[in-house]
UniProtKB/Swiss-Prot annotation:
Protein known as: Small ribosomal subunit protein eS27
Keyword Zinc: yes
PROSITE patterns in alphabetical order: RIBOSOMAL_S27E (PS01168)
NCBIfam families, per database record: PRK00415.1 (NF001629)
Protein family according to the UniProt entry: Belongs to the eukaryotic ribosomal protein eS27 family.
Gene designation per UniProt: rps27e
Alphabetized GO MF terms: structural constituent of ribosome; zinc ion binding
Signal sequence region: none
The keyword Zinc is assigned to this record: yes
Amino acid sequence: MIGVIFYNTKGNFLRVKCLDCGNQQVVFDRAASYVQCIICGKTLVEPTGGKSKIKAQILEVLD
């Protein structure tokens, strides 16, 4: 039997909505790099060394 290991992360995935074009996408709240909207290119998430700065509307927190 093959064992599967799941690690608990401190962060969460978020569904966010771009304020410019209205596109929805899923991002990690502790991102290590800039995350941009795949439609218009606006920066949605900025890394800060811990929890990221979210520059979009948060619609829901995903489990």
